[in-house]
Regions:
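Conserved short histidine dyad/triad with adjacent acidic residue
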Residues: 15, 27-36, 46-64, 99-102, ...
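A short hydrophobic beta-strand segment most commonly corresponding to one strand
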Residues: 95-100, 110-123
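A short beta-strand-loop-beta hairpin characteristic of the jelly-roll/cupin
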Residues: 58, 63-64, 69-90
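Short acidic, Pro/Gly- and aromatic-enriched capping/linker segments at domain boundaries
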Residues: 2-15
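Short acidic-glycine-tyrosine-enriched beta hairpin
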Residues: 52-53, 82-100
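Short, Lys/Arg- and Gly-enriched loop/turn segments at beta-strand edges
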Residues: 34, 87, 103-109
Length: 123
């Protein structure tokens, strides 16, 4: 039997040597475990935060308060970094926020819609 590797995309937001935030696309490998599906290795976490963000959310330059995964459940999140690049994260998308220092990023609601998300802290 051939095992099929699956991958799940995570977008990393981190501070580069230039003290600017950057995006990096990562792929988390998952192993085929048959009937239960594909699973990744365990990733240690410290807490889970449930969050609702209002439709007018517009948070100017800031850094992530700690290393954390942000999982979008409903709605969308627009993240802008220093070079003007925007990425929009929608339901099912995962971001690993690690830009703890430097200029940081801007976060905004998309299309005047509220957002529900999970913050899964790592530190």
């Amino acid at each position: 039997m051939t095992t099929i590797k699956r991958r799940m995309r995570v977008t990393r937001l981190y501070t580069g040597a230039d003290q600017q935030s950057h995006f990096e696309d990562l792929e988390i490998e998952m192993d085929d475990l048959g009937l239960i599906g594909h699973l990744s290795a365990r990733h240690p976490v410290t807490s889970l935060i449930f969050r609702h963000t209002d439709a007018d959310y517009d948070y100017s330059w800031h850094n992530a308060p700690q290393r954390q995964y942000i999982v979008i459940l409903e709605g969308s999140l627009d993240v802008e970094i220093g070079d003007g690049t925007h990425r929009v994260f929608g339901a099912g998308d995962i971001m690993l926020a690690e830009d703890l220092t430097g200029q940081g990023h801007i976060s905004r609601a998309v299309d005047g819609q509220p957002r529900r998300s999970l913050f899964i802290t790592l530190d």
